[in-house]
Every structure is written in structure tokens, then in C-alpha cells.
């Protein structure tokens, strides 16, 4: 496989950007080697600058649920751009997308559009603090909620790959208001509330963790977190930046029957354009400026092109589309498990809907500690063998892979065939 142009571009990029990239996980630090520079994408495939074609399971880290360059999404964006790329004023497209969100998630009684998932989560935290008059928040070890200072404590995603439990630059006075507990461990959370319950403004969680790889909630865990929040007067914030509109038309909240106080969105809601949102209970959201005193603002919030892209993509995500995703994702997970068994490589394939991770572990993976115990060297060998055989996976053991409605049975078959070779390569690594 030729990679000369990617290598040359990476050399130039290292002179221009920290680590040669504009988001850490793209640098391949978790797997080694040269990141591929992508020239174009269509459907379920991406093509790098050297002309190598890959079945894409990164999908821009989740947003491209209908695939790359879907004609209806492209048409919607082009039509919006003809009318103006940004107004800095309200537009009808904001209403269209918001109404569709509330139609599918009635518990989002009011919402605010922003420009990223990080902006959504940091805003939700501010709102929770302002609404409750409390300062502390609780997050779970390994859950990533964006790059905001209060949330870079025991975070997953790129922080996990780099082995940084916290980030320099986050003041101790900020970090001390972020309390943590292990994911899937209700008794541990109960102890946190027993110690600090009166000062806790909110608990924020990924309902299905995607940023330590996919961690599946144990039965009763999510509702248990909600019940503890209600008991102690804290808000229950569900971070659906990754899971929203991906796991079902109602996201993870719809899938698991949750009714959060606040919920955050990103990724799918913008179909590849920069969009985030937060929303929830009417009485809470009515405290947000200009209706209330809790300030939040953004120059590009509700950008008309982004609103058009999100609306077009969500309209395409019918119940039939979700059924197709489930069938394809189950086939891929089963195929990967079988290929690993053939190679006698112990793995755990964790999956919920169209999110999955192959963990190189003998034991079940259900929290940050069990994820960190995985064999990342084997994952690196597996990743590079898959890349050589035309399957583009997340370049980290601690990230989720995604499928789109553009993926086909042939894509899955090609990927499973590549995995047979890749697991054999991984088996050679101690």
C-alpha cells in the first residue's frame, strides 16, 4: 500500500500543527505509523491522497450516519448556502430542526443550538450549576464529554490514548469541583452522594460509553443514576453527543427509557457540519439567557447550512434505516467474533446498535479499569493489518467504530475477510 503522499503531508503538517493534526487521536499515537490524509469520501468509503480506498468505520467520529456525501444532505446544504452561509440572526431552518428533535425526543422541551459537542456539554454544566446553585459535578472515569476544563478529569478518548489522566492547564480550583466514580458502579456513586450530595449540581454520563471504546451499561445502572440524582436534588445530564439519533430515533434515552433533566447532542445532529445542542426540561432551559440569567451565546449557533444538513439527515433516519443499521452491525460484530475465535485471539466485541469496539482482552470489559487492561499492542497490529486490507478503523483501542446506512453486506464481508488476516497478525504479538 502506497503512503508516500500521506507521509509528505504529515511532515508538512508537523511544522504547522501541534503533533501534525487538529485533534489528537488523528495522529495515530495510539497505534503508531503515519496517519492517512483523506482526499475524498462517498457513501461508506474514503479514499486517501495516495489513492487507497477504505471501508470507513470512523465516519468522522460518528456524524456520518447516512454515509458520506448523501445526495439529499448535499442538496440541502447547497440550497441553504445559496441563501447565505451565516446570518447571526434567527432563521426558519432552526425551527425545522428543533421541531424534528422534539418530535423524536419529547423530553427535550426546549433546546439551544451550539457549534460543537464540547460547547453543548460545558453549557449544560453551567446551566445545571446555575439552576441548582451548587458547584460540584460528577462524571464517570473514562467518560469523555469534550475538552472543557471541568470535564477533563479522568476523561477518555484522546486523553486516554495519550495516557493523560488530566490535562495541564486545568486549574486545581476547577478540577476539585469535578467528582468521579467508576462507570457501571452504583454503590460507588452512592458513596459520592453520601459524602458530597448537598453540593452536587449534576451527574453527567455517556449512556453508552464510546470514548473508552464501547462500554455497555449494566441493567438498572442508568435508571439507578437517575434515581440518585432525583433523591439528592441534582440534575441528570445524559451526554448523547455520540449516541443521539444513532442508537435509535430517540437516542440512548429512547432505547433505555430514560427521561433526563438535560441532554446534549452533537455529531449526527449536524451530519458532518459543526453542530451541537443542549436541552431538556422547560423550567431548567427557561433559566438560560435571554429568558433567564444563565449566560450562553455563540456567533455561529444555529448556522443555516448546519441546520439544513442535520434536518436532512434526521429525515432520512426512518425506523427502516435503524433496522438496517442493526442488521449490518450485528453481522459485523458476529463476523469479527468468529474471525478472532478462528485465530485463537481472545477478544471482547462490545456493541450497542451501530457502535462497536473490539477489545483485546480475555475478560469482559465494562468500565475504565477493564478497558485499560486490554492489550493495546495487539490492537495496534490488528489496526494496521486492517488498514492494509482496506478497512479504516478508529486508530485507538479506546474509541468506538461506527456503521452507516450506506454500508452494505459486501462492505461487511470485505471487513470480516480482512479481520481474518488481521487477527492472525495480532496473534503474533505478545
Swiss-Prot record:
EC top class named in words: isomerase
Main location: cytoplasm
UniProt modified residues of type N6-(pyridoxal phosphate)lysine: 267
EC number, UniProt record: 5.4.3.8
Superkingdom of this protein's organism: Bacteria
GO CC field: cytoplasm
Requisite cofactors: pyridoxal 5'-phosphate
Subcellular localization: Cytoplasm
Pathway: Porphyrin-containing compound metabolism; protoporphyrin-IX biosynthesis; 5-aminolevulinate from L-glutamyl-tRNA(Glu): step 2/2
GO MF entries: glutamate-1-semialdehyde 2,1-aminomutase activity; pyridoxal phosphate binding; transaminase activity
Assigned protein family: Belongs to the class-III pyridoxal-phosphate-dependent aminotransferase family. HemL subfamily.
Subunit field text: Homodimer.
Protein name according to UniProt: Glutamate-1-semialdehyde 2,1-aminomutase
Amino acid at each position: 500500500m502506497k503512503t508516500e503522499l500521506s507521509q509528505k503531508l504529515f511532515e508538512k503538517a508537523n511544522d504547522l500543527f501541534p503533533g501534525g493534526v487538529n485533534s489528537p487521536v488523528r495522529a495515530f499515537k495510539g497505534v503508531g505509523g503515519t496517519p492517512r490524509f483523506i482526499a475524498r469520501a462517498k457513501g461508506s468509503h474514503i479514499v486517501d491522497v495516495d489513492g487507497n480506498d477504505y471501508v470507513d468505520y470512523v465516519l468522522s467520529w460518528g456524524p456520518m450516519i447516512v454515509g458520506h456525501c448523501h445526495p439529499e444532505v448535499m442538496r440541502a446544504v447547497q440550497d441553504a448556502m445559496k441563501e447565505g452561509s451565516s446570518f447571526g440572526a434567527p432563521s426558519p431552518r432552526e425551527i425545522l430542526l428543533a421541531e424534528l428533535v422534539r418530535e423524536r425526543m419529547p423530553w427535550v422541551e426546549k433546546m439551544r443550538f451550539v457549534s460543537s459537542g464540547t460547547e453543548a456539554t460545558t453549557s449544560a454544566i453551567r446551566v445545571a450549576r446555575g439552576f441548582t446553585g451548587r458547584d460540584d459535578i460528577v462524571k464517570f472515569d473514562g467518560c469523555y464529554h469534550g475538552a472543557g476544563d471541568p470535564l477533563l478529569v479522568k476523561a477518555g478518548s484522546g486523553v486516554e490514548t495519550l495516557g493523560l489522566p488530566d490535562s495541564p492547564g486545568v486549574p486545581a480550583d476547577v478540577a476539585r469541583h469535578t467528582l468521579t466514580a467508576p462507570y457501571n458502579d452504583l454503590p460507588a456513586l452512592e458513596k459520592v452522594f453520601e459524602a458530597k450530595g448537598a453540593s452536587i449540581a449534576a451527574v453527567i454520563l455517556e449512556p453508552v460509553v464510546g470514548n473508552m471504546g464501547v462500554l455497555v451499561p449494566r441493567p438498572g445502572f442508568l435508571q439507578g443514576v437517575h434515581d440518585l440524582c432525583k433523591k439528592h436534588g441534582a440534575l441528570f445530564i445524559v451526554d448523547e453527543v455520540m449516541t443521539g439519533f444513532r442508537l435509535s430515533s430517540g437516542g440512548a434515552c429512547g432505547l433505555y427509557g430514560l427521561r433526563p433533566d438535560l441532554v446534549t447532542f452533537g455529531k449526527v445532529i449536524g451530519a458532518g457540519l459543526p453542530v451541537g445542542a443542549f436541552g431538556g426540561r422547560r423550567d431548567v432551559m427557561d433559566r438560560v439567557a435571554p429568558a433567564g440569567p444563565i449566560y450562553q451565546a455563540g456567533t455561529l449557533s444555529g448556522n443555516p447550512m448546519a441546520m439544513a444538513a442535520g434536518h436532512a439527515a434526521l429525515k432520512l433516519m426512518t425506523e427502516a434505516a435503524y433496522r438496517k443499521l442493526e442488521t449490518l452491525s450485528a453481522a459485523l460484530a458476529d463476523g469479527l467474533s468468529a474471525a478472532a475465535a478462528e485465530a485463537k485471539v481472545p477478544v471482547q466485541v462490545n456493541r450497542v446498535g451501530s457502535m462497536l469496539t473490539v477489545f483485546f482482552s480475555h475478560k469482559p470489559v465494562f468500565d475504565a479499569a477493564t478497558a485499560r487492561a486490554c492489550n493495546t499492542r495487539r490492537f495496534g497490529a490488528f489496526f494496521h493489518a486492517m488498514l492494509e486490507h482496506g478497512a479504516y478503523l478508529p486508530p485507538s483501542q479506546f474509541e468506538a467504530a461506527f456503521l452507516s446506512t450506506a454500508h452494505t453486506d459486501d462492505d461487511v464481508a470485505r471487513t470480516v475477510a480482512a479481520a481474518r488476516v488481521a487477527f492472525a497478525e495480532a496473534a503474533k504479538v505478545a
